[in-house]
Amino acid sequence: MYANVKPEDLITVTIKSRKETLFEGRAFSVTSQNEGGFFDILPFHTNYVTLVKDFVVLDKGLATEKNIQLDKGIVTVTSNIVRVYVGI
């Protein structure tokens, strides 16, 4: 799936709306946009909380890329776990 990447080096990602889980799994990167512009979350990212808008892309530029459209949401990063709450 990811060449030369150990499973423990991937980010655990959960993306949820009020009604359903949109994604639950592992990814190498998470890309989105906030008021300051575009940003990436990579493995072992520092703890982080931000509001996001428009989209979340998992594994941007890789064969496993997944794009999730949203109006707005919140992203939290803690201990290599990314949680995205859509529609907040």
Regions found by a protein language model. Name each.
Residues 4-7:
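Structural preference for solvent-exposed beta-strand-turn elements
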Residues 12-88:
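Compact, glycine-rich, soluble single-domain proteins
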